[in-house]
Amino acid sequence: IVTVDCSDYPKPVCSPENMPVCGSDSKTYSNKCDFCNAVADSNGTLTLSHFGKC
């Protein structure tokens, strides 16, 4: 199982780093910060599919 530690999120501003991750919604998030903010917005229903683009 692939996981991302989102304990430090959500953050008001994410850095522009480009390290894509693929969410369970089949959307590519530009980095862990953007993904974790989306997890927070989804009330935990969004999960990580895999690292890299979807």
Curated annotation (Swiss-Prot):
Disulfide feature: 6-36, 14-33, 22-54
Q: What is its main location?
A: secreted
Q: Which Gene3D superfamilies does the entry mention?
A: 3.30.60.30
Domain of life of the organism encoding this protein: Eukaryota
Identify the keywords attached in UniProt to this record, alphabetized. Answer: Disulfide bond, Glycoprotein, Protease inhibitor, Repeat, Secreted, Serine protease inhibitor
Kazal-like domain location = 4-54
Cellular component terms per the entry's GO annotation: extracellular region
The UniProt GO MF terms for this protein read: serine-type endopeptidase inhibitor activity
Q: Where is this site: Reactive bond 3?
A: 16-17
The record, for Pfam families, names: Kazal_1
Task: Name the SMART domains for this protein.
Answer: KAZAL
What are the subcellular locations of this protein? Secreted
Q: Which residues are glycosylated?
A: 43
- Please state what the annotation says regarding this protein's domains: Avian ovomucoid consists of three homologous, tandem Kazal family inhibitory domains.
Stated name of the protein? Ovomucoid
Q: Which organism is it from?
A: Nycticorax nycticorax
